[in-house]
A protein has these predicted regions:
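Catalytic-core environment of secreted peptidases
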Residues: 23-46, 54-62, 83, 121-126, ...
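Noncatalytic luminal/extracellular "stalk/propeptide" segments of secretory-pathway proteins
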Residues: 32-131
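His/Asp/Glu-rich mid-to-C-terminal helical/loop segments that flank catalytic regions of hydrolases
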Residues: 251, 366-402
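N-terminal export signals
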Residues: 3-21
């Protein structure tokens, strides 16, 4: 797809739906529309409008959508910045750490491990609770921490707030890797600094989008298909491929008989400790272990920048189903997660609940990056091929005795 074609789609209203005959073209349209909606943080106005848009896509695929609410104490950053040597650097607070008041925190700056009041650390996306940074947060040695985010490309790449409901440690302000050299020099100098991570909280209702496709025997354990739909930025390649495959699977499964029901959920709350999928499970006691299986369309499916594919599965049979289907579609399995390992993403709730699951998570140089947007971020043909893979796996699980 050319940039001109992409921009032509992006110039349309964010929630207009256009149905193309070719799946790759439909995929590109879906991802462009999703990106064009704005920043997809859980519980935001964009998140709610995107849920309505996705529900319309479910109806277009021939199913009846539901919007299932769950409670959220939404964090709205009001002032998040770090001032040092006359420069003010904006950032994003870590959402599962403490915050500051309006006055912020002042003190001497130093490298992590040094004698200082505010420390400088660094972390790749989603590793803020691990390593030296995680240790520093747990010991509360410092009044506050500045974290240089190290993604696959330069920029601000926040970590998810896995402990959103049980925050810990001092305030942490995440900043772009492009500020790294200046901040490291300032820390070595022991500069006087000021950090503010002021937020407001607002009680709201976020929503999951769900649907159910009836099979021949509703008494059989269902297949559950899940994909997250929220994130820190516009998330074109992070979330777009999974959402497109989720909709395409509905469209394909609607055309043929199935032995059992298929339940679909696109969950919000991904970046906040998977709040949405946990709410979905809580509304359905026992669904994790009583289901025939779960399919998880994780992050970065069909991402074009430094791509790769990680397979996660509960058992050998499910892994073989997915790996064989990927091989048949010409898609490489870059990495297989060892059996028994706690999987990444929403598949974690199934693993911990003793359910059966199969999952794909992609690699992506733009993961959690503000620059995750535009036609160069995705490969629609690869996403379309994953659509073939997921149809094959879903039909296998939904049609056999398990």
């Amino acid at each position: 797809m050319t940039r001109r074609e992409w921009l032509a789609m992006m110039s349309t209203a964010p929630f207009v739906r256009r149905v193309a005959a070719d799946r790759a073209e439909r995929v590109a349209q879906i991802v462009a529309a999703f990106e064009n909606q704005g920043i997809h943080r859980t519980g935001s106005d964009v998140d709610r409008a995107s849920a309505e848009w996705l529900a319309a896509g479910v109806r277009d695929a021939g199913l009846t959508p539901s919007l299932e609410p769950f409670p959220l104490s939404r964090v709205d950053p009001i002032d998040a910045a770090f001032t040092v040597r006359g420069r003010r650097i904006s950032g994003v607070p870590l959402f599962d750490a403490a915050f500051t008041g309006a006055a912020g925190i002042e003190g001497r700056f130093g490298l992590l491990g040094a004698e200082a009041e505010l420390a400088l650390a660094e972390s790749p996306p989603n590793a803020a609770a691990a390593g030296a940074l995680g240790d520093a947060r747990r010991t509360s040695r410092y009044k506050a921490i500045v974290c240089i985010t190290r993604g696959g490309r330069p920029g601000l790449c926040p970590s998810n707030a896995d402990a959103f409901l049980k925050p810990f440690g001092p305030p942490v302000l995440q900043v772009s890797s492009e500020e790294g050299g200046f901040l490291e020099e300032s820390a070595r100098q022991g500069a006087a600094v000021h950090l503010v991570a002021r937020v407001e909280r607002k009680p709201i209702q976020a929503v999951n989008v769900t649907a159910r496709l009836a099979g021949a025997d509703g008494s059989l354990p269902p297949l559950v298909v899940m994909t997250p739909r929220s994130g820190w930025w516009t998330c074109a390649s992070e979330r777009g491929g999974g959402i497109a495959c989720w909709l395409e699977l509905m469209r394909e499964l609607k055309t043929g008989p199935l032995a059992r029901d298929v339940v679909f959920v696109a969950s919000s709350g991904h970046e906040l400790g998977h709040l949405g999928i946990n709410a979905f499970v809580d509304r359905r006691p026992g669904i994790v272990s009583r289901s025939a299986g779960w399919m998880h369309f994780g992050a970065n499916i069909g991402a074009a920048q430094d791509p790769g594919n990680t397979v996660q599965a509960s058992d050998d049979l499910f892994e073989k189903m997915l790996a064989d289907a990927m091989t048949a579609a010409g898609l490489a399995v870059t990495r297989r997660v060892p059996r028994g390992t706690v999987p990444g993403g929403e598949a974690e709730v199934v693993h911990r609940g003793g359910g059966r699951y199969v999952s794909v998570i992609g690699r992506n140089a733009l993961f959690h990056n503000l620059a995750d947007r535009g036609p160069e971020s995705i490969d629609p043909r690869v996403i379309s091929s994953f659509g073939d893979v997921f149809v094959r796996v879903a039909r296998s699980i939904a049609s056999r005795n398990l």
